[in-house]
Amino acid sequence: TSAPASLRDRLRRFLPPVPAPAPAPVSKDERARLDRLIAERTASHALARPDLTRGDALFTTHCASCHQVNGRGSLLGPQLDGIGARGVARLSEDILDPNRNVDAHFYLTTLKLRDGTTTAGFIRDESRATLLLVDTAGREHRLEKDKIAGRDTLAMSLMPATFENLLTKEQFDDLLGWLLSQRTQ
């Protein structure tokens, strides 16, 4: 048998959060289309001659607001030092299908506070009494859990899944080439 709802509600603030549900699965047709796109871009990159200067500029324009490489950019999303070691296929997948492999540290959580306000960000640390939330501007907020009325977590990446349309194939190769050149030294 389970505990009464009133007891569960009182104990909830002392328990770890329930894991967020997995994102809605993409259809078989969409998964197949993305798999073909990733394979196509991976194969075509082998023949490309990426311009690393343009790739660097594309990183600054499209990626640095969330990602950091060698101290440049923001740490809102995953840190990318040594990203080049992932290889062409994995980087193509990460860029073209960002919801395929999302680390739980980068799920967006929206908190409704007891004072009626809401705040959103990424939970970076959580104890029995407090949690540390980093908002989408990169600011840290340590919140007492007893001031939180509710929490919703989106188990998807904030990275747009639009890079296949946002970048030309040449730009994609330039960005991919630059990312591949970023290896730990």
Regions found by a protein language model. Name each.
Residues 1-50, 61, 69-72, 178-185:
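Post-cleavage N-terminal segment of exported redox proteins
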Residues 41, 45-46, 50, 74-106, ...:
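Primarily the internal scaffold of c-type cytochrome electron-transfer domains
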Residues 48-69, 84-87, 175:
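Sequence/structural segment immediately N-terminal to covalent heme-attachment motifs in c-type
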Residues 57-79, 101-104, 117-119, 125-132, ...:
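Periplasmic/extracellular electron-transfer cofactor-ligation site
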Residues 109-115:
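A short beta-strand micro-motif
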Residues 138-158, 162:
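Structured surface patches comprising rigid loops and adjacent beta-strands/short helices at the edges
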Residues 162-185:
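Long, low-complexity intrinsically disordered regions
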